[in-house]
């Protein structure tokens, strides 16, 4: 079966990295595709002997046609995965300061921050129809490639679940569909022999086993997610991102995220586990 990937997102969020990775995987890649030739390009691809194609759409694609409507029509006809990349404004400002590149909307006296927010609004429609939204704020190139690999492997069908532990003091993940707050639970950070360990450690696990409220909370989250995931599968949603947060993202959220992964995998769901802030102080 022919496979099509559409990559879009904010300038500076990683589209170039994503397209380079897709090219390495053998995809025929076309960058900055104007909206008025998307469907014509699809026809050429479908009649060719190529098996995989990736198309990048950014804010400049709107100048020639409506790329979003074209992508919606393509999704109805083909096995297409739409990936949207974003990052926090603060991180995008930092990246632009490092590269000293000019934002595509930064003209007529408009500042960089205003250009970023304008682009966010313009691309909000394509974010809404994306199968996968990836927040690259805390990712390096390797982590982005690893995340893309997971979604591409599972492109053939079904709903994948991405469970991410995080620390509220480091910010809530922008791409989370669900966020659960574990800060009310007992905290092993205040136990001297457990403070330096993580929620993946057997001694921390034993600590949580002493508190029935922890398991009760996990069971409640599991029940909610099971209903939601099954409904997402029915409607064709490709990915659900679940954020589990505690104060620092090292103990409670990590333990709960890992337990939920184990429980959901037993039900046959495809799950990717990520601990965003586990190495942070």
Swiss-Prot record:
GTP binds at residues 58-61. Keywords: ATP-binding, GTP-binding, Nucleotide-binding. It comes from the Bacteria. It comes from Thermotoga sp. (strain RQ2). Transmembrane segments: none annotated. Belongs to the RapZ-like family. ATP binds at residues 9-16. InterPro entries: P-loop_NTPase (IPR027417), RapZ-like (IPR005337), RapZ-like_N (IPR053930), RapZ_C (IPR053931). NCBIfam families: PRK05416.1 (NF003828). It holds the Pfam family PapZ_C. Displays ATPase and GTPase activities. PANTHER family: RNASE ADAPTER PROTEIN RAPZ. This is Nucleotide-binding protein TRQ2_1124. One of its GO terms (molecular function) is ATP binding. The lineage of its organism: Bacteria, Thermotogati, Thermotogota, Thermotogae, Thermotogales.
